[in-house]
C-alpha cells in the first residue's frame, strides 16, 4: 500500500484539478472546481481510499484519486483500441472522461461525512484486511446513485451517455446493472459503447492496483 505524505496528497489533488481544466470548460468546469474545492468535497477527494479492504484495490489514504486517474487513462486507451479495430466511437472524449472521473464519486460520501472511515478494530485489520469501513452516518446508497445525487446537488449537468456510463461502470459485478448488459431483445440492448469501455477500464484498473498490492507483499 502507498503511504502518501501531505505534500504528495496535495500534488495528486493539483494534478486532478489540472486534468479537469484540460477536459472541461465554461460553467461546467467552474461547478466541478467548486464541488472539489476545499470548502466542499476537497478534503474527501484528497483523503478517500478507493475501497475498504487492502486486497481489493487502492485501500489507502489517497487511493480514490489514484483509482479514478487510472480509470481515465485506461478508458482513453481502450477507446483508441476500439478505433484501431475499425469500430465507430459514438461518444466524445469529454463524455468519456466525465464518466471516468465520476464513476466512483459516491465513494466521497457527503460534505463533512466521508463514505469510508478508518477501521478501528485491529482484529478486522489483521484477519480481514479491512482498513476502512462504511460510514453509518450517511444514508445508504449505491455508490453510483450517490455519484449522480452529488452531481445534481452541485448543479452539474450530464448527458444521457455520461449517466449510463457512470451507472454501469461495475458491469456484471453489480446485480442491479445486469439487465442492461444481458438482453434478449435487440431494441433493449445498450445503444452506446461507453458503458462497456468504462467497465473494462475500471476492471483493468482494479486488477492493476490489486496486482501492485500483491507484488508489494513480503511473501
Positions of PLM-derived features:
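Non-catalytic interface/linker regions that flank or bridge core catalytic/transmembrane domains
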Residues: 1-49
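Conserved hydrophobic/aromatic pocket- or pore-lining residues that grip, position, or stack substrates
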Residues: 71
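Structural motif corresponding to the C-terminal cap of alpha-helices
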Residues: 75-83
Amino acid at each position: 500500500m502507498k503511504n502518501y505524505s501531505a505534500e504528495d496528497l496535495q500534488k495528486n489533488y493539483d494534478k486532478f484539478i489540472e486534468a479537469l481544466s484540460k477536459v472541461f470548460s465554461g460553467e461546467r468546469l467552474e461547478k466541478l472546481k467548486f464541488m472539489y474545492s476545499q470548502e466542499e468535497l476537497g478534503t474527501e477527494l484528497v483523503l478517500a481510499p478507493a475501497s475498504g479492504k487492502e486486497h481489493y484495490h487502492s485501500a489507502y489514504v489517497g487511493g480514490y484519486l489514484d483509482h479514478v486517474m487510472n480509470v481515465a487513462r485506461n478508458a482513453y486507451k481502450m477507446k483508441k483500441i476500439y478505433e484501431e479495430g475499425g469500430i465507430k466511437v459514438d461518444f466524445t472524449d469529454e463524455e468519456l472522461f466525465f464518466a471516468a472521473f465520476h464513476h466512483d464519486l459516491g465513494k466521497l460520501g457527503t460534505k463533512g461525512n466521508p463514505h469510508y472511515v478508518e477501521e478501528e478494530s485491529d482484529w478486522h485489520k489483521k484477519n480481514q484486511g479491512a482498513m476502512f469501513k462504511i460510514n453509518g452516518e450517511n444514508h445508504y446508497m449505491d455508490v453510483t446513485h450517490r455519484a449522480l445525487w452529488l452531481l445534481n446537488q452541485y448543479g452539474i449537468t450530464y448527458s444521457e451517455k455520461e449517466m449510463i456510463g457512470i451507472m454501469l461502470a461495475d458491469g456484471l459485478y453489480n446485480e442491479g446493472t445486469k439487465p442492461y448488459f444481458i438482453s434478449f431483445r435487440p431494441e433493449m440492448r445498450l445503444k452506446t459503447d461507453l458503458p462497456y469501455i468504462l467497465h473494462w477500464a475500471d476492471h483493468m484498473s482494479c486488477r492493476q492496483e490489486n496486482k501492485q498490492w500483491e507484488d508489494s507483499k513480503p511473501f
